[in-house]
């Protein structure tokens, strides 16, 4: 039986709109939905195999991108949100009733502070940036996926035109390393 990576990629990838203006994300409650408004498109959208990201039922991966913190606001039912793990670098805000993760925010000193992590699939609008790569691919093994199936997973991503990484994509890893180099004085702060 073929593996389900994620509903947004299982049957091919739909190209997003570079001029997409944004939209609302909704939790999965049947009524009184938590609504998060996003101005603009996501960036660095990718399939993520980590154990912390929210995944739809049956999917091995989440699809997650980032938006500037100032481009995200909770538009309805903020009282239904809770932080799942206050000690985590990415504080994931989820609906207390349905469990859907609406956004993740970093409040500590971190290379991605100022960016909020979101799942654009929770929107009813089409045009969000399509996935650009697959990250933390090997992490699905830690969650119970048999290691013998990893070649099939990587091949499926590659057939969709997505590179697979066991961390993040090289540009994002370079950003993290640059941040760290500046912080520890090895690189100019003006870089």
From Swiss-Prot:
Protein's UniProt keywords contain Mitochondrion: no
Q: Which UniProt keywords apply?
A: Lyase, Metal-binding, Zinc
BP GO terms, sorted: formaldehyde catabolic process
Where is Zn(2+) 1 bound in this sequence?
Answer: 27, 29, 95, 98
> Where is each CENP-V/GFA domain found?
20-166
Q: Could you confirm whether the keyword Repeat appears in this record?
A: no
Q: Which residues form a coiled coil?
A: none
Q: Which Gene3D superfamilies match?
A: glutathione-dependent formaldehyde- activating enzyme (gfa)
Residues annotated as binding Zn(2+) 2 = 48, 50, 53
Q: In which pathway does it act?
A: One-carbon metabolism; formaldehyde degradation; formate from formaldehyde (glutathione route): step 1/3
So what EC number does this one have?
A: 4.4.1.22
| Catalytic activity field | S-(hydroxymethyl)glutathione = glutathione + formaldehyde
Under Pfam families, the record lists: GFA (PF04828)
Q: How is the cofactor bound?
A: Binds 2 Zn(2+) ions per subunit.
Name the coenzymes or cofactors required. Answer: Zn(2+)
Q: Which GO terms describe its molecular function?
A: S-(hydroxymethyl)glutathione synthase activity; zinc ion binding
Q: Which PROSITE patterns match?
A: CENP_V_GFA
The similarity comment for this entry is: Belongs to the Gfa family.
Q: What does this protein do?
A: Catalyzes the condensation of formaldehyde and glutathione to S-hydroxymethylglutathione.
Q: Which PANTHER family match?
A: CENP-V_GFA DOMAIN-CONTAINING PROTEIN-RELATED, GFA DOMAIN-CONTAINING PROTEIN
Output this protein's name: Putative glutathione-dependent formaldehyde-activating enzyme
The protein's organism comes out as Aspergillus oryzae (strain ATCC 42149 / RIB 40) (Yellow koji mold)
